Design a protein with these regions (language model features):
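N-terminal active-site segment of His-dependent metallophosphoesterases
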Residues: 1-70
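Binuclear metal-dependent phosphoesterase catalytic core
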Residues: 2-3, 118-128, 133-135, 226-227, ...
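Extended active-site neighborhood of metal-dependent phosphoesterases/phosphodiesterases
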Residues: 2-4, 61-189, 278-281
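His/acidic metal-ligating clusters that form di-metal
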Residues: 39-43, 132-136, 148-253, 257
Length: 294
């Protein structure tokens, strides 16, 4: 049982879309250095698009970027977004690169479902599991449905919310994994277990937050079209019905930076790494967000 803090209040530094290249790795590391110094997190989470183009040596770039965390002995974990597939590296091989970097917390991985970085990390303090951090792999585009289901090539999938991307997010098999695994863990524990979700591509429910600002207690900035998934895998509904998920935190968008309340949960969309990161302080029942602008 890995202890992440004492007292049961965890500090999570969440960032996405670092998009590392040989040209920007050192500058990105300097930015992360400042963020780590300001946030003093118990755990850092790379929430997708750490890479988004072909690169010669991802391990070296990742080691450079994460140097500030390594030097401070800050553990970190990760989930893949759509950018990781653009490296041209098979996901299993790229996953092994991430795992090889010091400080990586791999978590308890799910087998037999879509993606390689679906994982659960029990967040422990003082010998107890305070909540579960659940990571989902959202590496696909909706064009993948052409091969899987024979849908028309590159046709826009109609959806009530406008999204200018062909994004696919958490799929039904991943939603079913959460439902099965969560029930099993609660039964084994003998009591409900709180969860916090982190994955790259926002859900359609995230896009509802800025459209209903008063009702959802909107906080932040909404200044670009939503890049939410256009095929709804049902993860928000499953989370709400469980009554055990406190927050669903996503990325993928560039400058949108907001959170709000939906069905008793906090739904949040973080800006890309170039614009900042979030320090999320939580005991598993509620999440407080502080924006880091290093």
């Amino acid at each position: 049982m890995t202890e992440f803090c004492r007292g049961g209040v965890f500090r999570l530094l969440i960032l996405h879309s670092a998009r590392l290249t040989p040209e920007n790795a050192e500058g990105s590391a300097a930015r992360l250095e400042a963020m780590a110094a300001e946030a003093s997190p118990d755990l850092a989470i790379l929430n997708g698009d750490t890479f988004s183009s072909p690169i010669p040596d991802p391990g070296a770039l990742l080691g450079t970027f994460l140097g500030p965390l390594t030097r401070r002995a800050i553990p970190w974990t990760y989930a893949f977004g759509d950018g990781e597939r653009k490296t041209g590296i098979p996901p299993e091989e790229l996953d092994a690169v991430f795992v090889s970097v010091p400080g990586c917390v791999r978590g308890e991985r799910a087998e037999g479902i879509d993606g390689v970085t679906n994982a659960v990390i029990p967040m422990c303090a003082d010998g107890e599991i305070r909540f579960l951090l659940r990571l989902f792999d959202t590496h696909r585009e909706t064009t993948d449905y052409e091969m899987a289901y024979g849908s028309p090539g590159r046709s826009r999938l109609p959806y009530p919310l406008y999204s200018h991307h062909y994004m696919d997010g958490v799929r039904f098999c991943q939603t079913a994994w959460f439902d099965r695994d969560h029930r099993k863990r609660c039964e084994a524990a003998g009591h409900p277990l709180r969860e916090l979700f982190v994955f790259h591509t926002p859900t359609p429910e995230h896009a509802q937050i800025p459209l209903n600002q008063a009702l959802c207690r909107f906080d932040g900035v909404f200044c670009e079209d939503s890049k939410c998934q256009t095929v709804n895998g049902g993860i928000s509904c499953a989370a709400a019905e469980s009554r055990d998920v406190s927050a669903i935190l996503c990325g993928h968008e560039e400058t949108n930076d907001y959170f709000g309340s939906w069905a008793g949960m906090t739904l949040g969309v973080l800006p890309a790494f170039a614009s900042g990161a979030w320090l999320v302080t939580t005991d598993g029942t509620a999440a407080a967000v502080r924006r880091i602008r290093a």
